[in-house]
Amino acid sequence: MSASRLISRDPYTGEAIADFAVNDARSIDAACHSARAAFAEWAMTPLAERRAIALRFAETVRARREEIATLIARETGKPMWEALTEADSVAAKVAISIRAQDERAGERSEPMADATARLAHRPHGVLAVIGPFNFPMHLANGHIVPALLAGNAVVFKPSEKTPACGQLMGELWRAAGLPDHVLTIVIGGGEAGEALVRHEALDGVLFTGGVQAGRAIHRALADAPHKILALELGGNAPLVVWDVADIEAAAHLIVQSAYVTAGQRCTCARRLILPEGARGDALLEALTMLMDRLVIGGPFQSPAPFMGPVIDAHAAAQVLAAQDRMTADGGRPLRLAAVREARSALLSPGLIELTDAPLRDEEIFGPLLQVRRAADFDAALALANATRFGLAAGLISDDEALYRRFWTSVRAGIVNWNRPTTGASSAAPFGGVGGSGNHRPSAYYAADYSAYPVAGLESPSPVYRLPIGLNP
């Protein structure tokens, strides 16, 4: 990316997809002020009309499903089958968000003796949405849909890795009839993001992405408590496997947890916690055998791959550097992550045992899973909680009593039992605790931060009865 141009590249081939002009501070200023002007009319647009536009957006997405998925696959490198599921999720978000708005941010009234108590919700104003590259349309859309339904105007900056998906998002909303400047797309990297976050016309920032960027946004808004801030910052998810009879099924769940989307989901398992001894050894043997059979390749190849490349060569280098650090710490490589094809960000999955190595609490955003052993379940729980993050956690076990202990003890916002750690429902809260962020972004509870509650006492006419005395 130059100071004025941004080239989107295919992570698998390295080929250029599109070339974009980068928004500078002046154009971002214009976008924010245009959004502020558009907000006034959009907020007064009847809710039924705002919902009708959102429903047309969902219809447009369904009608252009293949086109959308193809662009997602090209720009992220994820397999076409997975890109299709993302396109479907973009459309499905509308109905979910409408229901969430009714249930969590609708209007309520309660009769009183001489008035009516009313609860309603108002939009904040102009919200910035800053999206990630791993689900460039689905996760950003999880902020955009509830924000627009609530009556906000939105300035959306997609990841600099996936600008074409961001531009397509704007095109789809325009095709649905969204008025001009209610949703504005700005393109750029860190400088554009900083100019957007610090803009005086904003009423809040909704961010999904890395920890460092999220903390920088938090600091930038530290003296602006009037601005809403929703952060989803990733995780270092533990997956505990304990007292399970079907080892092969457990291995499949581990692979789904750690390596889907080339390990580039914030809910991916980063730490596999196994029992010491023969049971743990058997699990690792089944896991490595399954890893050796995984199909890895380009997004459009046949047969379809399980996983494609990471987002770019820099991301691949970061994964390999983390693997080198783990090995230097005394880790025992069971399968080494390695670049599979020249000029590509395609990595094979890595697995490294670190039971006797120091704990490093970091999110490795790629297909690299570390293994640690525990003497008993209490020790496994302690290892699971040995992180400042708290997004997702999982237990694979036949013992429901162990799961109840896990559920009440593990510190995470998403806790799964005998399902991949990456499994989540858009109809349920999504988000974590600790270093994983605040609020519950991109899902059902996004309605909570898209509008603020307003309480009032209402009477159709003045009440003239005067008190005969005053309270002492």
From Swiss-Prot:
EC number(s) given by UniProt: 1.2.1.71
Catalyzed chemical reaction(s): N-succinyl-L-glutamate 5-semialdehyde + NAD(+) + H2O = N-succinyl-L-glutamate + NADH + 2 H(+)
GO molecular function: succinylglutamate-semialdehyde dehydrogenase activity
SUPFAM superfamilies reported in the protein's UniProt record: ALDH-like (SSF53720)
Active site: E232, C266
Pfam families found in the cross-reference section: Aldedh (PF00171)
Bilayer-spanning residue ranges: none
GO biological process, one term: arginine catabolic process to glutamate
Presence of the UniProt keyword Aminoacyl-tRNA synthetase in the record: no
Keyword Nucleotidyltransferase in annotation: no
Record keywords: Arginine metabolism, NAD, Oxidoreductase
Matching CDD domains: ALDH_SGSD_AstD
Pathway(s) per entry: Amino-acid degradation; L-arginine degradation via AST pathway; L-glutamate and succinate from L-arginine: step 4/5
UniProt binding sites for NAD(+): G209, G210, V211, Q212, A213, G214
InterPro entries referenced in this protein's UniProt entry, alphabetically: Ald_DH/histidinol_DH, Ald_DH_C, Ald_DH_CS_CYS, Ald_DH_CS_GLU, Ald_DH_N, Aldehyde_DH_dom, SuccinylGlu_semiald_DH_AstD
Role according to the record: Catalyzes the NAD-dependent reduction of succinylglutamate semialdehyde into succinylglutamate.
Family to which this protein belongs: Belongs to the aldehyde dehydrogenase family. AstD subfamily.
Protein name (record): N-succinylglutamate 5-semialdehyde dehydrogenase 1
Organism: Caulobacter vibrioides (strain ATCC 19089 / CIP 103742 / CB 15)
